[in-house]
């Protein structure tokens, strides 16, 4: 599960992934993180 700081970061991440970017690369570029749980931390709610 990916978690982003806000909607802008989420849109960035989705666009990055759509164009073939890897999860780690898109996470770094768009300030998103990946979690193994079903909920996101408060620092990355989106």
From Swiss-Prot:
Function statement: Thionins are small plant proteins which are toxic to animal cells. They seem to exert their toxic effect at the level of the cell membrane. Their precise function is not known.
Paired cysteines (S-S): 3-40, 4-32, 12-30, 16-26
GO BP, sorted A to Z: defense response
GO CC field: extracellular region
Molecular-function GO term, any one: toxin activity
Subcellular location: Secreted
Gene3D superfamilies associated with the record: Thionin-like (3.30.1350.10)
One of the Pfam families matching this protein, by short name: Thionin
Keyword Nucleotide-binding in annotation: no
Record protein name field: Hellethionin-D
Family membership noted in the UniProt record: Belongs to the plant thionin (TC 1.C.44) family. 4 C-C subfamily.
Key word Iron-sulfur present: no
Highest rank taxon of the organism: Eukaryota
Keywords: Disulfide bond, Plant defense, Secreted, Toxin
